[in-house]
């Protein structure tokens, strides 16, 4: 899932490594397409 997370970062403009896990969890919960 590292690749997916890396792809998410630039899209959401987060750019924070420690936040990756939390963000992915939130995205999964939201079920964003």
Swiss-Prot record:
Q: Does the keyword Transit peptide apply?
A: no
Pro-segment residues?
1-10, 19-33
Q: Which domain of life is it from?
A: Eukaryota
Briefly state the modifications made to the protein after translation: Processed by the macrocyclase-peptidase enzyme POPB to yield a toxic cyclic decapeptide. POPB first removes 10 residues from the N-terminus. Conformational trapping of the remaining peptide forces the enzyme to release this intermediate rather than proceed to macrocyclization. The enzyme rebinds the remaining peptide in a different conformation and catalyzes macrocyclization of the N-terminal 8 residues.
> Cyclopeptide (Ile-Pro) cross-link position in this chain?
11-18
Q: Where is this cross-link: 2'-cysteinyl-6'-hydroxytryptophan sulfoxide (Trp-Cys)?
A: 12-16
The Gene Ontology terms for molecular function here are: toxin activity
InterPro entries, per the entry:
Amanitin/phalloidin
Q: Which UniProt keywords apply?
A: Thioether bond, Toxin
The entry assigns this protein to a family as follows: Belongs to the MSDIN fungal toxin family.
What this chain does, per the record? Toxin belonging to the bicyclic octapeptides amatoxins that acts by binding non-competitively to RNA polymerase II and greatly slowing the elongation of transcripts from target promoters.
Q: What else is known?
A: The typical symptoms of amatoxin poisoning are gastro-intestinal distress beginning 6-12 hours after ingestion, a remission phase lasting 12-24 hours, and progressive loss of liver function culminating in death within 3-5 days. One of the few effective treatments is liver transplantation.
Recorded protein name is Beta-amanitin proprotein
Source taxonomy lineage? Eukaryota, Fungi, Dikarya, Basidiomycota, Agaricomycotina
